[in-house]
């Protein structure tokens, strides 16, 4: 069998409801002579994630790690992976082979360290508050300035040597993004043939779940800021950019501000209650 052109690492903690669709997308239309090396790093699972992953992707290597830690799972899988470029894909995200391969191609270019396909949000099952929130979020500099992360990031061989193994952080994707200068990152929307490259994220369905997930992201951002107190020139600056347009209504901006304010309040409450290290994720978007 020929060497794999790239590796795909999928950390998964109790992702039995979604890991099949993730794996089916990874292998969709993949040529038999260029199959990726796929490692599913199931960690601390108490559901059927491992069994479903093995059934959905017989060619993948499925780890059954005892500790429920995304970062540890990514590091364990990375230590076993043999191919580069190396792409790290959340189990609740979908990205097809063509987009993964196009990202890997970009990562072979000189000077490119980290890359992601274009981000698409599936808001079809979200309430009006969440839809309004993401209409604003998608216009913010974090997303528009060479986004790497939010469910998928790829690393070149040199980048793997630079950032792996990852430290124990909440915001692993932000840590990776900030490890590279803007000119070292790429966000690609088209492959060399002009075909669309993207991955699909399924955000929380309700405003309440969105607030809980955003509070975890805030904790991750604050944790990174404290780690990098000595200064990081690649640090993502929190900048909000609001401009009323035909697509972006004042009500959208209001919803965004309200949710962000609620996130800050929840963060302070959790800190007072000693819950600042508790892992939070959205279960609604993972439901069938």
Segments and roles (model prediction):
Residues 24-35:
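Short, acidic, metal-binding catalytic loop of nucleotide-sugar glycosyltransferases
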Residues 25, 39-50, 67:
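A conserved acidic beta->alpha catalytic loop
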């Amino acid at each position: 069998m020929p060497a794999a052109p790239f590796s795909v690492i999928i950390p998964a903690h109790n992702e039995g409801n979604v890991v099949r669709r993730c794996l089916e997308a990874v292998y969709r239309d993949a040529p038999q002579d260029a199959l990726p090396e796929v490692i599913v790093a199931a960690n601390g699972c108490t559901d059927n994630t491992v069994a479903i992953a093995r059934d959905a992707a017989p060619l993948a290597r499925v780890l059954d790690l005892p500790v429920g830690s995304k970062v540890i799972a990514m590091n364990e899988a990375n230590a076993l992976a043999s191919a580069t470029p190396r792409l790290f894909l959340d189990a609740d995200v979908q990205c097809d082979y063509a987009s993964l391969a196009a990202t890997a191609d970009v990562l072979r270019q000189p000077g490119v360290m980290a890359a992601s396909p274009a981000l698409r949000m599936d808001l079809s099952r979200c309430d009006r508050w969440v839809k309004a929130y993401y209409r604003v979020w998608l216009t913010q500099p974090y997303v528009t300035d060479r986004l790497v992360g939010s469910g998928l990031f790829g690393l070149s061989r040199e980048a793997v040597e630079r950032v792996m193994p990852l430290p124990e952080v909440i915001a692993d994707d932000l840590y990776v993004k900030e490890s590279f200068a803007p000119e070292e990152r790429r966000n690609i929307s088209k492959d060399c043939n002009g075909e669309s490259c993207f991955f699909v994220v399924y955000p929380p369905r309700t405003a309440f779940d969105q607030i809980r997930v955003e509070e975890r992201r805030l904790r991750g951002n604050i944790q990174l800021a404290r780690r990098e107190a000595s200064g990081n020139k690649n640090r993502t600056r929190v900048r909000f950019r609001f401009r009323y347009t035909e697509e972006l209504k004042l009500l959208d901006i209001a919803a965004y501000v309200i949710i962000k304010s609620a996130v800050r309040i929840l963060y302070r409450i959790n800190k007072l209650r000693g819950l600042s290290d508790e892992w939070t994720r959205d279960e609604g978007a993972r439901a069938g």
